[in-house]
A protein has these predicted regions:
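Structured beta-strand-rich core segments of catalytic domains in phosphoester-bond hydrolases
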Residues: 61-159
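Metal-dependent phosphoester-hydrolase catalytic domains
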Residues: 187-197, 203-305
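Acidic/histidine-rich helix-loop elements
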Residues: 21-41, 96-101, 129-133, 159-173
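Bacterial N-terminal signal peptides
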Residues: 1-4
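His/acidic metal-ligating clusters that form di-metal
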Residues: 138-156, 170-212
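Active-site environment of divalent metal-dependent phosphoester hydrolases
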Residues: 26-28, 63-66, 161-162, 203-209
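N-terminal, active-site-proximal structural segment of metallo-dependent hydrolase catalytic domains
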Residues: 6-76, 86-95, 106, 179-182, ...
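Structural recognition of the beta-strand scaffold that forms the well-ordered cores
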Residues: 18-21, 54-59, 82-83, 109-111, ...
């Protein structure tokens, strides 16, 4: 395996960081009552990939009840938790970006930390379309203190593709959203010897031309990839297969390190192809059984396998 080249500011053993991101597919139960959100909230909180992280980034926390259940279940392991993007405005240290316009749901992103959160901010993207345009899409920024060492984490969920034939518009919106992330980092004036991590469902297919543009635009090194070769897999994931049986599997979820700040000696993204205990839902007299935590697989990142 060829490791990515990381420049100066190598992290020492006592400043290692392990982050996991997971798009949990908590759609609002009022609109989508048959996706086992409450069952999956309990299953996810007990899943092996949840254990032993420093930071968790969650996407698609659109349903209030299952989100509250998940966060409550994880409170003992991850006591420091941001609100969901777009909610509880008085609990954020700062709010940036586009705050006007009618939105029908929150932004779905929350960060949970084993270590104290020193600062938490939310930013709303200026552009979005389709269902994303009706949500308070943006990113969550936290500064955490791990045993005296500061780390900066941005969790986000970029514009999704609309329809089966991309027209380029969604990629253009993702590009503007990445530019907002870069501008935010620039304006924060974060010390160069402190690590900055960007993670979440970025909706960019690994290996595509957009992927290589993303690495450049976000100013991040390409990580080493281990684990499953897709994070949204219609051939192995029962939920993804049910929803989109004709679409090809895709690698969409990442945890990346900003080049301009402290670097680990190596950085792995590990996609976990994990099955959950069986859970069932009923609709119109028919019972459906699934064995997946979500339609996306979680991704963990660290500087050690």
């Amino acid at each position: 395996m060829t490791l990515p080249h990381f420049s100066a500011h190598a992290a020492t053993e006592d400043t290692n960081l392990k982050v996991t991101t997971h798009n949990v597919y908590f759609l609002p139960q009022a609109l989508y009552p048959n996706w086992g959100q409450m069952q999956r909230a309990d299953l996810i909180s007990k899943a092996p990939f949840i254990e032993n992280n420093d930071v968790m980034i969650f996407n698609e926390l659109f349903d209030a009840k299952s989100t509250a259940q998940l966060k409550s279940n994880l409170k003992s392991s991850y006591p420091h938790q941001t609100p969901v993007l777009g909610e509880e405005k008085d609990k954020w240290d700062a709010t940036h970006g586009r705050t006007s316009g009618a939105k029908f749901t929150n932004g779905g992103v929350s960060i949970l930390s084993r270590y104290p959160i020193m600062r938490q901010e939310q930013h709303f993207y200026t552009q979005g379309r389709g269902a994303d345009g009706m949500a308070k899409k943006g990113f969550v920024y936290v500064k955490i203190n791990k045993n005296g060492h500061p780390f900066h984490i941005i969790g986000t969920h970029l514009q999704s593709e609309i329809g089966k034939r991309p027209e380029g518009k969604d990629a253009e919106i993702r590009s503007t959203q990445m530019a907002e992330i870069r501008q935010f980092i620039k304006e924060k004036n974060i010390p160069k010897n402190e690590m900055v991590v960007i993670g979440g469902d970025l909706n960019v297919i690994k290996g595509s031309s957009e992927y290589h543009a993303m690495l450049s635009q976000l100013n991040v090194n390409e990580p080493s990839y281990i684990g499953h070769n897709q994070t949204w897999d219609t051939t192995t994931n029962s939920i993804a297969k049910y929803n989109y049986p004709d679409l090809k599997p895709q690698y969409l979820d990442y945890i990346l390190v900003d080049k301009a700040h402290a670097q680990p000696s190596q950085w792995y993204n590990n996609a976990h192809r994990v099955s959950s205990p069986e859970w069932t839902v009923s609709s119109w007299g028919k019972t459906y059984t699934y064995q997946d935590y979500s339609d996306h697989y979680p991704v963990s990142a660290s500087n050690a396998e």
